[in-house]
């Protein structure tokens, strides 16, 4: 059960989230892996989760009718949000807003086929008061098995 050096799913998700549109085209995604990227901004954490889940489903990163895939994605999203919000997933309740780029990557990071597929969610952007200029950069990463 070795993690393949060229198949680091979390690193790939982070690079995609950090990359500008022109930079993401030069990243080498392992064969058979799926991914999507997007942007979301809101004071409502439910909207942030819903936007990422919708992107993953509409880009066929996860199957819409398989519960375990949606469940794995949800937990990876929540883990990434914990990183961005420093463990407090409240936004509007404490007058915070986020503007994030996200990447969702699905693949097989381990040598052994028995380890199966994993999903990684990376978030990068800003968090702060809902006043222009009152925010700072934040980053989060979540990884879960499917």
Swiss-Prot record:
GO terms for molecular function: mRNA binding. Pfam families: HutP (PF09021). Keywords: Activator, Histidine metabolism, RNA-binding, Transcription, Transcription regulation. Belongs to the HutP family. Homohexamer. Antiterminator that binds to cis-acting regulatory sequences on the mRNA in the presence of histidine, thereby suppressing transcription termination and activating the hut operon for histidine utilization. This is Hut operon positive regulatory protein. It comes from Bacillus cytotoxicus (strain DSM 22905 / CIP 110041 / 391-98 / NVH 391-98).
């Amino acid at each position: 059960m070795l993690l393949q050096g060229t198949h680091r799913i979390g690193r790939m998700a982070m690079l995609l989230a950090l990359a500008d549109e022109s930079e993401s085209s030069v990243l080498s995604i392992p064969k058979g892996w799926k991914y999507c990227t997007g942007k979301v901004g809101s004071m409502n954490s439910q909207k942030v989760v819903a936007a990422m889940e919708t992107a993953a489903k509409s880009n066929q990163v996860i199957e819409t009718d398989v519960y375990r895939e949606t469940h794995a994605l949800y937990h990876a999203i929540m883990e990434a949000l914990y990183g961005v919000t420093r463990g407090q997933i409240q936004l509007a309740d404490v007058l915070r807003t986020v503007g994030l780029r996200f990447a969702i990557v699905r693949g097989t990071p381990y040598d052994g086929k028995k380890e199966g597929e994993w999903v990684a969610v990376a978030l990068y952007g800003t968090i702060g008061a809902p006043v222009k200029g009152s925010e700072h950069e934040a980053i989060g990463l979540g990884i879960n098995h499917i």
